[in-house]
From Swiss-Prot:
Keyword tags: ATP-binding, Cytoplasm, Ligase, Nucleotide-binding, RNA-binding, tRNA processing, tRNA-binding
Entry's family note: Belongs to the TmcAL family.
Function per UniProt: Catalyzes the formation of N(4)-acetylcytidine (ac(4)C) at the wobble position of elongator tRNA(Met), using acetate and ATP as substrates. First activates an acetate ion to form acetyladenylate (Ac-AMP) and then transfers the acetyl group to tRNA to form ac(4)C34.
InterPro entries reported in the protein's UniProt record: Rossmann-like_a/b/a_fold, tRNA(Met)_cyd_acetate_ligase
NCBIfam families from the UniProt entry: PRK13670.1
Binding annotation for ATP: 7-20, 96, 152, 175
Keyword Nucleotide-binding: yes
Location(s) in or outside the cell: Cytoplasm
EC number: 6.3.4.-
Name of the protein this chain belongs to: tRNA(Met) cytidine acetate ligase
Amino acid sequence: MSISGIIAEYNPFHTGHKYLLEQAEGLKIVVMSGNFMQRGEPAIVDKWTRAQMALEHGADLVVEMPFLVSVQSADHFAKGAISILHRLGVEKLVFGTEEMLDYQKIADIYVDKSEEMENFVKNLPDNFSYPQKTQAMWQEFAGLTFTGDTPNHILALAYAKGVAGTGIQLSPVQRQGAGFHSEEVETSYASAIAIRKGADQLDLVRDFLPSASLFEEATKVSWRNYFPLLRYQITTHPDLSQVFQVNEELASRIRSAIGSVATVEELVEAVTTKRYTKARVRRVLTYILINAVETPLPDAVHVLGFSARGQAYLKQVKERVGLVTRIGKEPWDSLTQQADLVYQLGADAMAEQTYGRVPVRVE
C-alpha cells in the first residue's frame, strides 16, 4: 500500500482541499496546523473540527504541527511538517501549486548545491525580506522567477527543499479555481480567504464547504476576538524583545503603533516595512499574543483523528514513532498547549482544546 502525505491548514476545509485529497493515492496522512496559521492568524474554527472535516472527505490520519512549526516562514513550516510525515513513513508528498514545474528536479538541485545556496542567501543585503531572499536564491540557481502572488508555488519550492535527502517523492497537483489571495468565487472552487470573509453567507458556505453543517455549528473566531488581549500583552510586557523572533526594532515599532490603532489590520499596516512583510509582522504579533519563546520541538506526534484504516496504520508504526493520543498531566508540547489555552479565550463557547481530548474517529 502506498502512503501519501499532505501538508495543510484547512482554514477552513473547502472543495479545493477535497479535490487534492481525491488526487492522493493509498493511505492518506495529513499533517495540519493547529489553532494558529502559518501567516500569523487564528484558525476560523478549531483544529478538532477541521480534522473531522478532512476525515469525512478522504483523509485516513490527521496529525498536528507543533505551534513553532505551524506559525513560521515557508521553509521552516515545510521542513517541520515534512519531518513529521517522514517519521510516519510517507512515500509521496501531494500538494497544490499554481505552477506545474518539475519540483523533483528542483529538489535535486538543492541536494547538490544546498550549502552554496544557503551561503548565497546569507550574503544577500540585510534589507531584503525573507521572501525576496528566497526568490533571489531560486532565480540564481534554478532560473525561476516568481512573485508573492503565488504562495502555493512558494510553499512548493519550500517542500522541494524540505524533502531533500528524505526519499519522499513530490507529486504536484494543479491548483483549481480561485487564487490563494482571491476574494472571488467560481463555479466549483473558492479560496479559503473568500470563504472566511463570507463565513456568514449560508449559500457560499454550502456551495464550497463539503462539511458545511460542521462549519455552521462550530464556534468561529478571527483576530478581532484576540485584539484586546494582544493590546494588553504589548502594553504590559516588560521586554518584547524576549518574545520569539522579536528584535529591538520590531518591538519599538509595535509599541509605538499600538496606542493609535483599533484593529490588528491597522497595527500590521503601521508596523510593516519593506524589510518586515505583513506575513512576518502577523506572525510576530501571534508570538506576542501567545508570549512564545523558543522551545525544542516535541519528539512525539500528536494525533488529531483517524479513519479505521488510519487507526490500523497507527498500530503498525507505534513501536517506532512516539504517538500522543490524549494529553493529560504530561504535556505533549508546552508551547502548543499554551497557544491552545489562548485560543480558547477567543469565545466563551469555545470547546476545550487540549486536556482530555481524544482523536476524532470517522468510519
